Amino acid sequence: MQSSKDAIYSQPQQVSDFRFDDTVAEVFPDMIQRSVPGYNTIVDAIGQLAGRYATNNSNIYDLGCSLGAVSLAAAKYVVADNCSIIAVDNSEAMAQRCARHVKAYKANTPIEVICDDLQNIHIENASSVVMNFTLQFIDPTQRDQIIQSIYDGLAPGGIFILSEKLRHASEQGNELLIDLHHEFKRRNGYSELEISQKRESIENILRAETFEAHQTRLQNAGFDDVVLWFQCFNFASIVAIKS
């Protein structure tokens, strides 16, 4: 996935709320690589997990698919027969580019790209459902119902993979993780202005929760095992298993 370099916040500007529009979609691969520690590791491992748990004739859902990195990783590892991958994003700019990437990749496992709100998608016969840094952008009052519908749509033995930016339970710990993340971004070429303006643009729409809050929600939905399998600074990925 080739893209332009992310310079969206390189000049002083009147900062508005972050949106997944054409401007962001154009630079998204560069932005995500330079902003999320361990992103490639997370995506590849999600693909492995989807392949490991895929069963014949099942569905794999990538909710908030952006440009399709997770869907393509899953397609790479799935060997079960007659599986389908459903990639969903409510950003037309993202979904259009995702469809182009999928077409160019020519995966053996079919990938259907849908531009819609993930809450309009009926999850059924799923061996895996993935939300890779997606739930954090959804109204917290709607999150319980979303997770419950995912649990209900998973087949027994299926998994839900949830990657999120976390908020630490203590203010001191939270500030430490934020500082480490900002240093990560500096080392990846972002200026102080870019870091500050990006933080201002996203603070009203990315509402992070603690790991404990996610764990409680997943357990309340019915998941028997909740495993924190990856964390770097305040970025983490969780796999929840349905018996």
UniProtKB/Swiss-Prot annotation:
Gene Ontology terms: biological process: tRNA wobble uridine modification
Top-level EC class: transferase
Residues that bind S-adenosyl-L-methionine: 39, 64-66, 89-90, 117-118, 132, 199
Listed SUPFAM superfamilies: S-adenosyl-L-methionine-dependent methyltransferases (SSF53335)
EC number: 2.1.3.-
Keywords: S-adenosyl-L-methionine, Transferase
CDD domains reported in the protein's UniProt record: AdoMet_MTases
Summary of subunit composition and partner proteins: Homodimer.
Protein name: Carboxy-S-adenosyl-L-methionine synthase
Organism: Pseudoalteromonas atlantica (strain T6c / ATCC BAA-1087)
